[in-house]
């Protein structure tokens, strides 16, 4: 157990360093505020990763950091476009870090991706939603080739919680 915990600590630190590098690169252009846009819904276990992370971050972050998308106020397919418009109005020069659950290959379940560039929410369930973000973070919650949205309801909560803890701890370390 201690060895596994030590390994996770290294993962958190590595992810935190990568995120910090990306944000510092963008801050060099004069952008100071950071907005974490955590996408998903509390009505589907597999799609709850974003709001879980948002709730964890909202309790921890301060200063020039804003969190949008929590369990209490989720950002999902229905309100995503309106939320993006509001972000552009209130935080026009912010660095947007978009966070969402993803589905992928079964052997990738539990992995986290961190990329420079926008997130394309809904791809795993064949929805065409607006791409958003300067940096994207996804946690692969399940493996699915079918694109069946009902699949997300059968994903184990423990898997989603582990990813939420990993991602939120990494962000808080950064």
Where on the chain are the PLM-derived regions?
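Glycine-rich phosphate/diphosphate-binding loops that line cofactor/substrate pockets in enzymes
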Residues: 18-33
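Solvent-exposed alpha-helices and their adjacent loops that cap or buttress functional pockets
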Residues: 27-29, 60-61, 88-91, 105-106, ...
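Short beta-strand segments
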Residues: 38, 97-102, 136-140
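C-terminal folded domains that constitute the principal catalytic or ligand-binding module
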Residues: 122-174
